[in-house]
């Protein structure tokens, strides 16, 4: 189908947040904003088109503000953000979580004292034998340790969704002493809903999102459940808890961790915060702003634990390692209710561009309906739109592609957001080819 000549391929890492991938034949250049993340550019495009009903956009805006990470180039950046009407929330060094007025995102990113703006992205939630395989019983007994460890005197923090404050697991083993010290409910429609007393917590009963999700209750039980009236207990069942019901936006999650650490410090207690959530987006090398900020928060008496995830049997990640092959894969969606999808592709080595080809494929006729041909990231516009029609002309597919040479690790990146038109039945219609080489490859 394509002819590849004398190609030198490097390894490519491909992270897939499964949904769908749309390709097309028309190549239209869009405005480029070099100090905005690809995801931020996509959201601004939707704002410009007044596509406020789009679920991708709704998940990243808070009222009239865009939730984002901002890295300043100089200390003057903080005053400039304030002057622009921004709300600085959590700050670690030169990076902060910030609410930026929607009307000011472009102007803020253009300031010389601002180095980079990265819009907040949605994350997803990620066992009665967990204690056994983690050797918790030995820690409880103090086996080969200076003392037993049960969590007593420690704060267990959890940032998650769907929290039931009244659950029996959040009392002690006898079901008498209530162990949740306080909660911040980010999902509440009220500004900063905090509950700081047992009476307030039991009166509130649960977080505002608990009618559709109970993941946080489940996770907190594993981490710190008291085991009242059951043989099953959490890992640190004598600890106290500070919980944050989160919106699942990564900048809000950072704010939640910061809140728990600061409140634990106020109480004079060591703290472990659990994050049983994640996504498939990013370079997976510790250079995204969420990773940097969380890394800066930890230290003596402040630990963060992260779940391994639930994606082992899901095709959400692949890589091209062979020097004599080209990655070719269909990209499908895991949830047919989704109207959009995201694909994030990274070069494995700094300074090495890679090439991509997108096909629109009809399975019934076994034909390629349209193709972009191979294009290289070092020659394509940073912002591009591809469109194509289905064979009968009733459906229009669109993919918005945002590329960058990420300044914080020197690696080329292609981030794609694609729209899934209503009525598409073929779940394997989008065929992706990825290859790297020293010169552009064309098919």
For each of these PLM feature ranges, what is it?
Residues 12-13, 26-147, 154-155, 163, ...:
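Autoinhibitory N-terminal propeptides
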Residues 304-390:
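Polar, glycine-rich mid-to-C-terminal structural blocks
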Residues 143-253, 268, 301, 316, ...:
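Subtilisin-like serine protease catalytic core
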Residues 163-217, 267, 367, 371-428, ...:
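Active-site core segment of subtilase-fold serine proteases
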């Amino acid at each position: 189908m394509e002819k590849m000549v004398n190609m030198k391929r490097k390894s490519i890492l491909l992270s897939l947040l499964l949904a769908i991938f749309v390709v097309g034949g028309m190549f239209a250049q869009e405005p480029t904003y070099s100090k905005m993340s690809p995801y931020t550019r996509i959201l601004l495009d939707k704002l410009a088109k007044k596509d406020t009903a789009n679920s991708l956009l709704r998940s990243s805006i808070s009222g009239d503000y865009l939730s984002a990470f901002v890295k300043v180039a100089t200390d003057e950046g903080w005053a400039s953000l304030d002057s622009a009407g921004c709300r600085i929330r959590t700050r670690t060094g030169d990076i902060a979580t910030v609410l930026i007025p929607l009307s000011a995102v472009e102007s803020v990113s253009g300031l010389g004292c601002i180095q980079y703006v990265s819009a907040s992205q949605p994350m997803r939630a990620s066992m009665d034998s967990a204690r056994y395989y983690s050797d918790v019983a030995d820690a409880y007994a103090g086996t080969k340790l200076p003392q037993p460890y049960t969590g007593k005197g420690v704060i267990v923090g959890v940032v998650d969704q769907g929290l039931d404050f009244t659950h029996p697991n959040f009392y002690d083993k006898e079901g008498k002493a209530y162990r949740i010290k306080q909660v911040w409910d980010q999902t509440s429609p009220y500004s900063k809903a905090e509950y700081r007393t047992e009476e307030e917590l039991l009166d509130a009963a649960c977080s505002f999102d608990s009618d559709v999700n109970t993941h946080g209750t489940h996770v907190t039980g594993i981490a710190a459940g008291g085991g009242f009236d059951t043989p099953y207990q959490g890992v640190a069942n004598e600890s106290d808890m500070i919980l944050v019901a989160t919106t699942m936006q990564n900048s809000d999650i950072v704010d939640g961790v910061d809140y728990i650490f600061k409140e634990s410090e106020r109480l004079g207690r060591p703290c472990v915060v659990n994050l049983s959530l994640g996504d498939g987006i990013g370079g997976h090398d510790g250079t995204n702003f969420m990773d940097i900020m969380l890394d800066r928060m930890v230290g003596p008496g402040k630990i963060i634990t992260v779940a391994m995830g639930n994606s082992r049997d899901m095709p959400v990640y692949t890589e091209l390692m062979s020097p004599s092959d080209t990655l070719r894969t269909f990209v499908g969606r895991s949830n047919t209710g989704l109207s959009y999808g995201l694909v994030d592709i990274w070069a494995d080595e700094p300074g090495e561009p890679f090439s991509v080809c997108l096909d629109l494929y009809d399975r019934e006729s076994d034909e390629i309906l349209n193709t972009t041909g191979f294009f290289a990231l070092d020659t394509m516009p940073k912002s591009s739109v591809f469109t194509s029609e289905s064979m009968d002309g009733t459906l229009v597919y669109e993919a918005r592609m945002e590329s960058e040479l990420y300044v914080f690790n020197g690696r080329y990146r292609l981030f794609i957001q694609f729209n899934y038109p209503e009525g598409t039945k073929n779940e394997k219609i989008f065929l992706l080819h990825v290859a790297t080489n020293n010169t552009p490859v064309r098919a």
